[in-house]
Amino acid sequence: MIYDTMLITGCAGDIALALARIAREAGAVRRLIGCDVHADHAGPAFFDACELVPRANEGTYLETLKRIVIAHGVDVIVPMSEAEIAVLLAAGHLGGFAGVPVLAANRLAIETGLDKYATFNRLAAHGLGVPWTRIVGEAPPLALPCILKRRRGQGGKDLRLVYTEEEVEIAKQTRPDDLWQELLLPEDQEYTCGLYRSRAGETRMIVLRRRLQGGLTGAAVVADSTPFSPLLHGIADALDLTGSINVQLRLTADGPKVFEINPRFSSTVRFRDKLGFQDFIWSLLESRGLAIGAYRAPSPDIRMYRCADEVIIG
């Protein structure tokens, strides 16, 4: 057991449920507490208790979170939504909150990943492969068709393809703070990459070629990480990375190009854990000053599939 009582936020979501299952299976904690903005979810089947919290942008969020920590004797917090991570970052609580550690990557990695324009600028400044990216209200797209996406928040939300100058003009009026981004092709060359750098400076990675279903990775196959290794090492260096992030890219005719960095655990975290890339457990161990052991990358071409599950609560 690494911790006694763990609080995982966003417990209605797929990532939090995956982390809860990993923690249970590994015997990493004695008790699991979850919290979310509503109670209509499967969390009670996986957590010992589920609490309600206001949305992260509401003024009472941190106060409510503190009450939960104290009431349940929580000794580690794992924030799962980017909105919550952003609030903890802004309040100076990335290292710890209410006297207990917060499990997260380093500050620079989080600041960069939360802002997709900052992601573009930092990686481009380090000579790493990125699609051209512009702020909608400041400059027109370099070419059409292109992607229109949020600057902050989940990249898949409100993402759309823009084909015409008429659509460009509408976006300039309605979404001036969002981003134009190069359309990366081919579509079937999309990869999600787990990237972990230990406190001792060891970099570990796993690359999965994925197929999306409903915005999530529905199926994936392990790819040889060798062609992506220089890029991923470069990202870890550019972010002075400590901890775990998720890198999303497409392999184009001009090489791999990164279109997003998620500064949190990935929705494929349980896929990866089963393949030996145990970034969640490594993060817990290192937060306690414990050794993480060796990592052996899985063989290419291993396939994995996300399956529906039935949960009864009552």
Predicted feature residues:
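ATP-binding N-terminal substructure of ATP-dependent carboxylate-amine bond-forming enzymes
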Residues: 1-103
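ATP-dependent carboxylate activation and anion-phosphoryl transfer catalytic cores
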Residues: 72, 226-314
